[in-house]
């Protein structure tokens, strides 16, 4: 987990969702979504924008993965509901999530927040990572009631 530090010269990294995701959530195509986001961002920032399309599965384990992209001069990540939001947060970059996902509890949810995105200390991010880890269950744990018991204990 990397602490967050935001120099001024950074760009906004847009990680568009897949077509499959957008169809499921009854949203515009990824291309339309991206153009809409870029247009709205111009109302709030003059930062440069870079677009990172989701790589194919075999490319995600190579040097072109999101963690590599986050090592560049990223001010914040904007996505719909990609795991990129979680990866950004865990790598010290704030994220704006415009749709539901596991990171929404920590993400900003409006493009108007792009210049002052919420950042978190290491302790908060460690707690978030632990929470995500603790919410992972095996098929057996779901079938035998372990998952349900743990979820009820923590609510």
PLM features: what roles do these ranges have?
Residues 7-58:
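Conserved catalytic-core segment of nucleotide-activated headgroup transferases in glycan assembly
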Residues 18-20, 101-104:
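Short loop/turn segments at secondary-structure transitions that flank enzyme active sites
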Residues 26-33, 62-66, 70, 155:
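Alpha-helix capping and helix-coil boundary motifs
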Residues 31-36, 97-99, 115-116:
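Short, low-complexity, polar/charged sequence segments that are solvent-exposed and flexible
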Residues 37-40, 102-105, 120-122:
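Glycine-rich loops and low-complexity Gly/Arg-rich segments
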Residues 42, 47-95, 100-102:
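Donor nucleotide-activated moiety binding/catalytic core segment of transferases
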């Amino acid at each position: 987990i990397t602490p967050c530090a935001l120099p001024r010269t950074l760009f906004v990294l847009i990680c568009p969702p897949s077509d499959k995701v957008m169809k499921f959530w009854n949203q515009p195509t990824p291309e339309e979504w991206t153009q809409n986001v870029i247009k709205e961002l111009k109302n709030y920032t003059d930062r440069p924008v870079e677009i990172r399309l989701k790589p194919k599965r075999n490319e995600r384990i190579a040097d072109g993965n999101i963690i590599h992209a986050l090592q560049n001069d990223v001010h914040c990540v904007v996505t719909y509901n990609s795991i990129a939001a979680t990866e950004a947060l865990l790598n010290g970059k704030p994220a704006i999530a415009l749709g539901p996902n596991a990171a929404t509890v920590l993400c900003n949810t409006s493009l108007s927040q792009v210049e002052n995105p919420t950042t978190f200390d290491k302790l908060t991010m460690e707690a978030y990572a632990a929470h995500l880890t603790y919410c992972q269950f095996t098929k057996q744990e779901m079938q035998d009631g372990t998952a349900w018991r743990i979820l009820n204990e923590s609510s």
